[in-house]
């Protein structure tokens, strides 16, 4: 009797759990909700990548100091004779620390190794993403980042830390590119796409700015391995959430996928090249200031350790403000994305030129905030433009075009840690900032080249002119199918079937 009641109760509990699981699964797979969950997953991946990129800033220099190798040196100890003469001597072995003359170079190479490998990997990862979709590369990227973070936590030599840093670059090439491309694919309406990419940029900024104090505090009070284990745990949870939402390894036929445009063809597109150049140019000041501004603050304004530690933290709020303003302007005036980017480049240039004139910490905060505000304008305006260019000129597959965007960022962050210190040593901090500011201001007029492209967004007549050469993007393909259907005797049914076939191809590709 009791056993039967227990079995019945267990059956009811199991049934309730199964029913609840089905409801949760059904809710997560509802299209609009699933799109929002995927945006959260991508934003967490961006946050983790940039936190891992910046969390080592307060940790690595001090840690390398503690593990700096010793070398065995033999010193001669003379012995005096009875009359004061040196009759014999003895040798004693002592441990002597290796000089740290090349420590700055080692740290610079370690910081740059992530961006260098990311730069080298992106041409291949972009093509891979175009072929298999966005979910598998995102999962691969999260997996690589997880193992990279674990390696950072327990690595105890420069070689292991270098390998972990380089491994992170490979993971970023998969996760960053596929994540941004997934957002562009899921959010097809221009204002929604700009808003979603702006949210992702906000997470990138937050990760970069909060990571140094996060890493420094945990490193000081809990040890080197704690901040990396925290990040690896969040990375693991993000990967599990991704597996709950999508089925990356479900069977898919090759015929149901759209073939993306080769990356080399996108690279020589003049419009995409202008956007990529702007993304590189606007990030050069940030990439070159991060490794040099602390020493300059110490020498120029006798800044304290806490001031150098929170140098970039106030800039987070203007960056968010820049994202918000650009999203609102793009929704109301979508034809002027190029103008928002050009204005951002000018702000970056002026801010970079005024940084050397600052003589205290309070003054320095103003140009740094303006610098990050300008970067937000450029990134938020131009990243959606890349997806739009692919939509109207090629096939609506975004892996390769956002691999080009990732390459643009990686160029700046690969050169910064290696070249910035040498430029300051040879030319000076003032000359470095004036040069970076001048480059940004001079590049701003190049975005005029995008003016006509942006004006095509609401112009159906110009899109129809493009369609005379045949369909290129997904939406143009649908329009062409509808035109053909209208000319056929039984156009309605065949036209609907063709349009549904195109849409199902895209859904089969991105799911």
Curated annotation (Swiss-Prot):
One of its GO terms (molecular function) is acetylcholine transmembrane transporter activity. It comes from the Eukaryota. Belongs to the major facilitator superfamily. Vesicular transporter family. InterPro entries: MFS, MFS_dom, MFS_trans_sf, MFS_Vesicular_Transporter. Pfam families: MFS_1. This is Vesicular acetylcholine transporter. It comes from Torpedo torpedo. GO terms for biological process: chemical synaptic transmission. It is found in: Membrane. It is a multi-pass membrane protein. The chain crosses the membrane at residues 37-57, 109-129, 136-156, 166-186, 198-218, 226-246, 268-288, 307-327, 338-358, 364-384, 401-421, 429-449. PROSITE patterns: MFS. Keywords: Glycoprotein, Membrane, Neurotransmitter transport, Transmembrane, Transmembrane helix, Transport. Glycans are attached at residues 80, 83, 88, 302. Residues 486-511 are annotated as: Disordered. High expression in the electric lobe of the brain. Residues 1-36, 130-135, 187-197, 247-267, 328-337, 385-400, 450-511 are cytoplasmic. Residues 58-108, 157-165, 219-225, 289-306, 359-363, 422-428 are lumenal, vesicle. Involved in acetylcholine transport into synaptic vesicles. One of its GO terms (cellular component) is AP-2 adaptor complex.
């Amino acid at each position: 009797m009791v056993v039967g009641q227990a079995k019945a109760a267990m059956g009811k509990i199991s049934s309730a759990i199964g029913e609840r699981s089905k409801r949760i699964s059904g809710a997560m797979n509802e299209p609009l909700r699933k799109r929002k969950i995927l945006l959260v997953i991508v934003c967490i991946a961006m946050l983790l990548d940039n936190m891992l990129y910046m969390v080592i800033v307060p940790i690595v220099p001090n840690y390398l100091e503690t593990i700096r190798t010793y070398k065995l040196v033999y010193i001669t100890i003379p012995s005096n004779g009875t009359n004061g003469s040196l009759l014999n001597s003895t040798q004693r072995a002592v441990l002597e620390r290796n000089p740290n003359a090349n420590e700055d170079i080692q740290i610079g190479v370690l910081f740059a190794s992530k961006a260098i490998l990311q730069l080298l990997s992106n041409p291949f990862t972009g093509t891979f993403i175009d072929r298999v979709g966005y979910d598998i590369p995102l999962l691969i990227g999260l997996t690589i980042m997880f193992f990279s973070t674990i390696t950072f936590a327990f690595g105890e030599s420069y070689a292991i830390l270098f390998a972990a840093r380089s491994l992170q670059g490979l993971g970023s090439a998969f996760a960053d590119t596929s994540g941004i491309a997934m957002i562009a694919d899921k959010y097809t309406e221009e204002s929604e796409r700009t808003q979603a990419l702006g949210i992702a940029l906000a997470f990138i900024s937050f990760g970069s700015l909060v990571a140094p104090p996060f890493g420094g505090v945990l490193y000081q009070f809990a040890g080197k391995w704690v901040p990396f284990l925290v990040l690896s745990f969040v990375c693991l949870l993000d990967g599990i959430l991704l597996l709950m939402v999508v089925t990356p390894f479900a069977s898919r036929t090759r015929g149901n996928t759209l073939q993306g445009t080769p990356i080399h063809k996108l690279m020589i597109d003049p419009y995409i090249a202008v956007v990529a150049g702007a993304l590189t140019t606007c990030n050069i000041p940030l990439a070159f200031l991060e490794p040099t501004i602390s020493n300059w603050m110490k020498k120029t304004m006798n800044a304290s350790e806490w001031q150098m530690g929170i140098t970039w933290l106030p800039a987070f709020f203007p960056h968010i403000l820049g994202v918000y303003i650009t999203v609102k302007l793009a929704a109301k005036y979508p034809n002027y994305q190029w103008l928002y980017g050009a204005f951002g480049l000018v702000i970056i240039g002026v801010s970079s030129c005024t940084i050397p004139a600052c003589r205290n910490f309070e003054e320095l905060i103003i140009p740094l905030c303006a610098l990050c505000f300008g970067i937000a304008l450029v990134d938020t305006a131009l990243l959606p433009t890349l997806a739009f260019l692919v939509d109207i000129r090629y096939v609506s597959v975004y892996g390769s075009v956002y691999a080009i965007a990732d390459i643009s960022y990686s160029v700046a962050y690969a050169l910064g840690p290696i070249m910035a210190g040498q430029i300051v040593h040879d030319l000076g901090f003032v000359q470095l900032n004036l040069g970076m500011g001048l480059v940004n201001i001079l590049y701003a007029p190049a975005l005029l080249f995008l003016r006509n492209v942006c004006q095509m967004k609401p112009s159906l007549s110009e899109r129809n002119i493009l369609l005379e050469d045949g369909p290129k993007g997904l939406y143009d393909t649908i329009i062409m199918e509808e035109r053909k259907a209208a000319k056929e005797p039984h156009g309605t049914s065949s036209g609907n079937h063709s349009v549904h076939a195109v849409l199902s191809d895209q859904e089969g590709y991105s799911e």
